[in-house]
From Swiss-Prot:
One Gene Ontology term, aspect cellular component: cytoplasm
Organism, as annotated: Salmonella typhi
The keyword Nuclease is assigned to this record: no
Subunit structure: Homodimer. Interacts with FtsZ.
Name the record gives this protein: Nucleoid occlusion factor SlmA
Length: 198
C-alpha cells in the first residue's frame, strides 16, 4: 500500500516537473495542452487525469509550491535578520533568485503561463504578490520600532515600489526568453533601489 502511494506521489511530481520544464521551453509561451504534457511525461491523457482531475489542478499544485517556497523563506529571513535594509534586500533577492532558478515557474509568476487558463489561477498569483507586499510593508513599518528611526515616505508606496522592481525584473527575464537573469548586476542595482527608501 505504501509503495503504491509513493509511486503515485512520484508520478504526480514527474507530471509537475514536466509541466514546469515545458513552461521553461518555447512551448511555455503557448498554451500547453494535456496531450502535449502527456506525451512529455510518456503517459496517456487518461493517466494524467488519474493523478490530477484537471490541468487547472496541476497549475494549482505548482502555485502552491511557489507560495510555500517564497513565504517560508521570507519568514526565515524575518526571523533571522533584524536590520531593516538587510531584510528588504534579502526578500527582494529571494524573489529574483527563485525566479531565476525556476524559469518555468516564473512564467506563472508573471502571468504569461496563465493567460490561457482559468482566471482563478491568476487570482492566486495576485494574492501571493499581495501577501509579499504586505510583508514588505510590515518590515518598513517596523523600522521605527527596531531602529528608532522610520521612513518619511509612505510605507505603502515604498513596498509597492520594491515589488514593482521584482515584477519588472521577472517580466524582463520571461520576455528575453530567460537571457536576462533577474539577479544580474543586483549588487549594483540594490543601492539605487535602497536610495529610494527614505
Amino acid at each position: 500500500m505504501a509503495e503504491k502511494q509513493t509511486a503515485k506521489r512520484n508520478r504526480r511530481e514527474e507530471i509537475l516537473q514536466s509541466l514546469a520544464l515545458m513552461l521553461e521551453s518555447s512551448d511555455g509561451s503557448q498554451r500547453i495542452t494535456t496531450a502535449k504534457l502527456a506525451a512529455s511525461v510518456g503517459v496517456s491523457e487518461a493517466a494524467l487525469y488519474r493523478h490530477f482531475p484537471s490541468k487547472t489542478r496541476m497549475f494549482d499544485s505548482l502555485i502552491e509550491f511557489i507560495e510555500d517556497s517564497l513565504i517560508t523563506r521570507i519568514n526565515l529571513i524575518l526571523k533571522d535578520e533584524k536590520d531593516t535594509s538587510t531584510r528588504l534586500r534579502l526578500i527582494v533577492l529571494l524573489i529574483l533568485g527563485f525566479g531565476e532558478r525556476n524559469p518555468g515557474l516564473t512564467r506563472i509568476l508573471t502571468g504569461h503561463a496563465l493567460m490561457f487558463e482559468q482566471d482563478r489561477l491568476q487570482g492566486r498569483i495576485n494574492q501571493l504578490f499581495e501577501r509579499i507586499e504586505a510583508q514588505l510593508r510590515q518590515v518598513l513599518r517596523e523600522k521605527r520600532m527596531r531602529e528608532g528611526e522610520g521612513y518619511t515616505t509612505d510605507k505603502n508606496l515604498l513596498a509597492s515600489q520594491l515589488l514593482a522592481f521584482c515584477e519588472g525584473m521577472l517580466s524582463r527575464f520571461v520576455r528575453s526568453e530567460f537571457k536576462y537573469r533577474p539577479t544580474d548586476d543586483f549588487d549594483a542595482r540594490w543601492p539605487l533601489i535602497a536610495a529610494q527608501l527614505q
